[in-house]
């Protein structure tokens, strides 16, 4: 059986731009992409904490250390600069891989600098 599991996540990033007149996608600071294990052109889910919108798109790298989080194209209608978002990448793996895999979870400061990187989430 193949399971779809959390691969990596950028938690509570601040949207810096929304560019309607662009082909599509989300632009993410390359440093943040690497910290979360997210690749160029990878499909991601974006959850807007402010308004509850959920969408899927693909990633293009932004300038390293810029803090850019820019929703492009039609996705720009669903977010506003200043909104907090969660950017989630998933991976398919078998059950043995899923039990061993530890996702990269990147917690953000308000200025889109990295607050903490962990390899798990815990509600304990």
From Swiss-Prot:
A single BP term in Gene Ontology: alanine biosynthetic process
PTM comment, free text: Is synthesized initially as an inactive proenzyme, which is activated by self-cleavage at a specific serine bond to produce a beta-subunit with a hydroxyl group at its C-terminus and an alpha-subunit with a pyruvoyl group at its N-terminus.
Residue positions binding substrate: 57, 73-75
Pfam families listed in its UniProt record: Asp_decarbox
Pyruvic acid (Ser): residues bearing it: 25
Keyword Lyase recorded: yes
Catalytic activity: L-aspartate + H(+) = beta-alanine + CO2
GO molecular function: aspartate 1-decarboxylase activity
Keywords in alphabetical order: Autocatalytic cleavage, Cytoplasm, Decarboxylase, Lyase, Pantothenate biosynthesis, Pyruvate, Schiff base, Zymogen
Main subcellular localisation: cytoplasm
Entry's EC annotation: 4.1.1.11
Top-level lineage group: Bacteria
Cofactor: binding comment: Binds 1 pyruvoyl group covalently per subunit.
Pathway where this protein functions: Cofactor biosynthesis; (R)-pantothenate biosynthesis; beta-alanine from L-aspartate: step 1/1
InterPro entries hit by this protein: Asp_de-COase-like_dom_sf, Asp_decarbox
GO cellular component annotations of the record: cytosol
PANTHER family, sorted: ASPARTATE 1-DECARBOXYLASE
NCBIfam families: panD
The protein's role, per its UniProt record: Catalyzes the pyruvoyl-dependent decarboxylation of aspartate to produce beta-alanine.
Family named by the database record: Belongs to the PanD family.
Subunit: Heterooctamer of four alpha and four beta subunits.
Protein name: Aspartate 1-decarboxylase
